[in-house]
């Protein structure tokens, strides 16, 4: 594993290994490469056919791959866990060959997620939710609570755990919603606007308040905010076997986008 010192290294890697028929999950953009290189968090490794980009996160590396030969193994020698996600559309297109490649290299299956969407139509009427006990997070206490819930309840490797700086940025834009129960902070929902889509990034309820309809209140508030903003579509990712969450989203009109990922982990 070699640290990337400049963008020219990435340009060479992509030019050399991104070929017709290359299997890849590499969706990093140029500005992301530049940002991660500047703080020393980007690394690469390769052989004569396959290449790997490692993005260092808090306690693990996220792996982006360019595979041109699947019937071989690779010796991964990272000192921290490695995690990757493989995107596919529909169970009939499940990438078994890619899964086998990673299993031969010592990776194990971790989590599977599905994407759900909801069109923003006239049916999503704007409601008066002032009595819903959901507010927009705005204080240091709210930020700390959001950070604690995300760190405590979401999967470390695939939960997209946000830094304090990222949470502060979302709060400053009015995109973190806080549910209260009898004045106590009970749950959060973090949203984001991207290209006309209003994404649900994180929805977490403190264990003390589960079963009290907190998630539903947060979801309704989020849908209302999207209707006010006239977004084109709502979208989210949910763990495939999280029946309670899937049921909640379906109840509010979300449909499966036929787009899934499964993650693999090497400790």
Model-found features: residue ranges?
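A short beta-loop-alpha structural element at the N-terminal edge
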Residues: 1-15, 131-146
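Conserved donor-binding loop and adjoining core beta-sheet/short helix segment
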Residues: 26-79, 189-201
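A conserved beta-strand-loop-helix scaffold within acyl/acetyltransferase catalytic domains
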Residues: 55-59, 160-182, 186-204
